[in-house]
């Protein structure tokens, strides 16, 4: 599946502020709150989780 312009924007946002990318992809659900927790505990795990969510869905 090719990347769209919105996917590229979400990836850039996920690198800068990971919860925003997850929120745009999945909304305000469990994935969003998991990503907030991961970002607080460590910035890199938050980025990895955000990229996983964006690339999976």
From Swiss-Prot:
Keywords: Cell membrane, Membrane, Transmembrane, Transmembrane helix. Its main location: membrane. Pfam families: Pmp3 (PF01679). It is found in: Cell membrane. One of its GO terms (cellular component) is plasma membrane. The chain crosses the membrane at residues 3-23, 34-54. Belongs to the UPF0057 (PMP3) family. PANTHER family: HYDROPHOBIC PROTEIN RCI2 LOW TEMPERATURE AND SALT RESPONSIVE PROTEIN LTI6 -RELATED, UPF0057 MEMBRANE PROTEIN ZK632.10-RELATED. Plays a role in the regulation of membrane potential. Could mediate a proton leak. This is Plasma membrane proteolipid 3. The gene is PMP3.
